[in-house]
Amino acid sequence: YYFHELIQRAQDITFLYNSSTQGSKTGEMSRFMLQLMTEWNHPIHRLTLQAGQEPMHCEAEVVEKNEAVLKRLDEISYFSPTAINTYITCQLKYYFKYIADIKETDEIDVDDVDNRIFGNIFHTAAQLMYEKLLPREVITAKDIDKLLKTGKSTQSLTSGNADLTLDDIVDESFAQELFNQQPGTRKHPKLNGLQLINREVIIKYLHQLLRIDRRTAPLRVIGHEFPVKRPLTIKVNGLEKQIETGGRIDRLDEIHVDSDKARLRVVDYKTGSKVAESLKSVDEMFDPKYLEKKSDYTMQAMLYSLIEATNDMEHNPNHHAVSPALLFIQHAGSEDYTPVLSIDTEEITDVTVYEEDFLRKLTDILEEIHNPDIAFEPTS
């Protein structure tokens, strides 16, 4: 009404709209404009205005390792798998992020759930599910079936969690990761439409995770979200330098409990669409072409597994064999799916078999980062 009242006595009317896209929203003319175009008998002229911009071709420059860069490198004593993968895929990106210390902004839009926040919510929900809804010791197929059927905690009345449901822990995860509430809080602002859809997807993924674990039950979850580190010695200008590498393990579990097949798995949850394929060799984990096309998480999974197999008496006191596992929840529907990594089509049942080759490649990369004669070059 107000729109038509506004234009009813006008002799010349100009409407403008922006057709550019912003995020997931596309610019388009309003329904009022579409109505005028189809119903009016007056002449309508359509013009398209374009900004005469020409993109400038900019070539990234090589950064030489001068005295200031080498001093900064000498100060760095900890190298995460993410940092190492960044160097492998783009040396210049590594320089800007870890030497020049130029960071990306880390803003959370509570009206949106991007891939990073979605992954954080799923990680937290999975951790809470195993801590509050399933037995703390050995988890059987029967326990998992009960949770899948009822959605209710299988823990004892004395645990304090007997009344919790799967919906409760998902709400707690949203409150914690999206709305920055304290752990244990389930109350949060009302979810919008997109957030409600993501909530249903999280629940679906948790059901998928339970069905995957049922195949290897009985199992025991040893820990969630805990840090691991390993010391390394590298050569820099002929001298030894002591550094550390490591990170945080999403989940460490023991499968085939109380059998001769018992072993530990370092499980890394992945909610994205990229999937890790079978490796031909350890060298492929450090190949930028493999990291770009397939998965850049294999080296991280191998490193964490080696730490658990050789350097973690707290979580692996019995020195069980350890397998690296990348659990891509989107691709885990088939009955023969296994998250355990493979090399040359052979499933890795004991990561220490590949320890020598892995540490050799890892050391080579770290020494290359410190080599003053090798500049930081952009990806070709």
Regions found by a protein language model. Give the residues of each.
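C-terminal, charged and often intrinsically disordered regions of DNA end-processing helicases
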Residues: S30-K132, Q242, H370, I374-S380
